[in-house]
Structures are given as C-alpha cells and as structure tokens.
From Swiss-Prot:
GO MF annotation: an example: copper ion binding
UniProt source species: Pseudomonas aeruginosa (strain ATCC 15692 / DSM 22644 / CIP 104116 / JCM 14847 / LMG 12228 / 1C / PRS 101 / PAO1)
Protein name per UniProt: Uncharacterized HTH-type transcriptional regulator PA4778
Gene Ontology biological process terms in this record: positive regulation of DNA-templated transcription
Keyword presence, Hydrolase: no
PROSITE patterns: HTH_MERR_2
PANTHER family xrefs: HEAVY METAL-DEPENDENT TRANSCRIPTIONAL REGULATOR HI_0293-RELATED, REDOX-CYCLING DRUG-SENSING TRANSCRIPTIONAL ACTIVATOR SOXR
Pfam hit, one: MerR-DNA-bind
Keywords associated with the record: Cytoplasm, DNA-binding, Transcription, Transcription regulation
DNA-binding positions: 4-23
C-alpha cells in the first residue's frame, strides 16, 4: 500500500510516517518502480505500535526502546516493565506539577472579583513574576 493508504489505516499523517522512517522508528519503506513508498502489514503493525506508545505519552526515545523490545522475541518482560514503570513515575511527577498549577490558578480565580473594576489579582500575580 502507498503512504496515503498506510496513513489512513494507521491514523497517522503521511508526514508523521515519513518522520518516523527518517528517525528509524520505522524501517525504510520499499519503493515502487515509480519511486513511491510501499508499506506492508508488518509496517502497519509497527505504525500502530508507535501510535499507541505515543498516545500513552512515551517519548520517541522510549518508543524506540519499546520497539526494540517488542521485536526481540528473547526479551525479558522485566525490561519492558521497568521502562513502563519509569514512565508512570514521570507521569505522576507531571500530574503533581499540573495539580499545583491548577490549585494556584484556582485560588487566583476565586480571589478575582470579576466585575467592572480594573483591580485583578490574576494580573497582579502574573506581573509579579518579572524583574525582581
């Protein structure tokens, strides 16, 4: 199948497929006599794997490691688990950061009168981060 068909079936854009190929997450596509890329079912499985990994928030480097493990039939599942567990720890750290940001902003929203007066604690807080 050509790149357009592979894109449609994988849910990725042709640009992303070419990018994944350029950074070697996807093997170089075969070429037709006219030079068009040609993808097979194995490529579609790899693209689905990449897409799902990215949907779960894995970095491109992590996706590469996961692909290597996926393709290695002699892999130890402990290696996969360790990589996934590290990712969970990173997600938890990011969630904590976002929760703190949300709480701070919620507090500012609650203290803003939201009326016709120009006084606004949200803007004061934003301006206070500059030039100490």
């Amino acid at each position: 199948m050509n790149i357009g068909e592979a894109a449609k079936k994988s849910g990725l854009t042709p640009k992303m497929i070419r990018y994944y190929e350029s950074i070697e997450l996807l093997r170089p596509a075969g070429r037709s006599a006219s030079g068009y890329r040609h993808y097979n079912e194995n490529d579609l499985h790899t693209l689905a794997f990449i897409r799902r990994s990215r949907d779960l928030g894995f970095s491109l480097d992590e996706v590469g490691k996961l692909l290597t493990l996926w393709q290695d039939r002699q892999r130890a599942s402990a290696d996969v688990k360790a990589l996934a567990a590290q990712h969970v720890r990173e997600l938890n750290r990011k969630i904590e950061e976002l929760s703190t940001l949300r709480d701070t902003l919620q507090d500012l929203v609650e203290h803003c009168q939201g009326d016709h007066r120009p006084d606004c604690p949200i803007l004061k807080d934003l301006a206070s981060g500059c030039c100490h």
